[in-house]
Swiss-Prot record:
It holds the Pfam family RimM. Keywords: Chaperone, Cytoplasm, Ribosome biogenesis, rRNA processing. One of its GO terms (molecular function) is ribosome binding. It is found in: Cytoplasm. It comes from Rickettsia felis (strain ATCC VR-1525 / URRWXCal2) (Rickettsia azadi). Disulfide bonds: none annotated. Its main location: cytoplasm. This is Ribosome maturation factor RimM. Binds ribosomal protein uS19.
């Protein structure tokens, strides 16, 4: 069994597709089909086998999943998370990070005082957005780029942004 620290979330089953047990897979890899090159596991470390049927216009993958053969079985998989082992991922460049490593990192202001933490990194198609939960428990969505986040380390990020209070 693998601890979740050794696993990286690479996809999630969004819904079923058709009557033959196919599922729509939202891949977090770039390109989306890169997920097919990984040895996939579930949260318990059990192997997951998917086979690509097609790709829709949203970039989501339509796949067969393990031995699922009916729509009813596929409907039960909505929200099912697919992981790969961290050790199997390519080595990153100095300024690259996996989203899993950024979530929950402290957010510092320009004076390096902690002002919150990263709650999530999102992408709705127009670029990455960082969701920050500030110390007062409010959250804000900001563009995830060098202008707003000029420094990223493995221990914290620096935010270049003045909040309106």
């Amino acid at each position: 069994m693998n601890s979740l620290e050794n696993l990286i979330l690479v996809g999630v089953i969004k819904s079923c597709h058709g009557i033959k047990g196919h599922v729509i897979l939202k891949s977090f890899t770039e390109p989306a089909t890169k997920i097919l090159e990984r040895n996939l596991v579930n949260e318990s470390g059990e192997d997951i086998h998917i086979k690509l049927i097609s790709q829709n216009t949203k970039g989501e993958l339509i796949c067969t999943f393990n031995d699922i053969a009916t729509r009813n079985e596929a409907e039960n998989l909505k929200g099912y998370k697919l992981f790969c082992l961290r050790a199997s991922l390519p080595k990153l460049e100095e300024d690259e990070f996996y989203i899993a490593d950024l979530n929950h990192l402290p957010v510092l202001n320009q004076d390096h005082k902690e002002i919150g933490k990263i709650k999530n990194i999102l992408n709705f198609g127009a670029g990455d957005i960082i969701e920050i939960e500030f110390l007062d428990q409010t959250t804000e969505l900001l563009p995830f780029n060098k202008e707003f986040i000029p420094l990223i380390t493995k221990d914290y990020v620096v935010l270049n942004y003045q909040r309106e209070i």
